[in-house]
Amino acid sequence: YATAVDYNKDAPTTRLFYKKVQNKMHYAVHGHTAAELIVERANAEKEHMGLTTWENAPDGKIVKPDVSIAKNYLKQVELEDMGKLVNSVLDLAERMANRHIPMTMEDWAKRIDIILEAGGDAVLHDAGKVSAEFAKSFAESEFEKYRVIQDKLFSSDFDKFNSLPFDDIKLSLIHISEPTRRS
């Protein structure tokens, strides 16, 4: 979309355009907007709070920013489908640019709908039923409940070290303090 003649990375209309495109892609893949997906899948009682990935996955803690990213809730098959859909749009953008065909962001919105329709995907024509603000608030509320559970289950390297029998700790410390030998 950066090739659109009316593209301005700092313009509010550009940010709104990206949100619309993101929601169209999500809707085509799983039938929900990004916000709807978060509200549907964020659940403090589920394993990993319903997330399938997060910044420190798979062994690190989930942190608050992780829970309001819709992509983090996608199943593997959905993630792969999303990737294919994004690639098809990028391939079209490259072809249009190579042929020097001027496009506006509105032109891109129409082309994306055409791509979705051609693939037999549902096309989102509105903003969905859940706002991004509500989804973020909901996910963060679920996270606060989940954090209590996670903190009980999670053991840090320090906790693991402290749970070692004393002889193992002594051996670990000896190993750490040994100078490295060079040949």
Protein language model features and the residues they cover:
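Positively charged, phosphate-engaging catalytic surfaces used for nucleic-acid and nucleotide handling
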Residues: 1-173, 177, 181
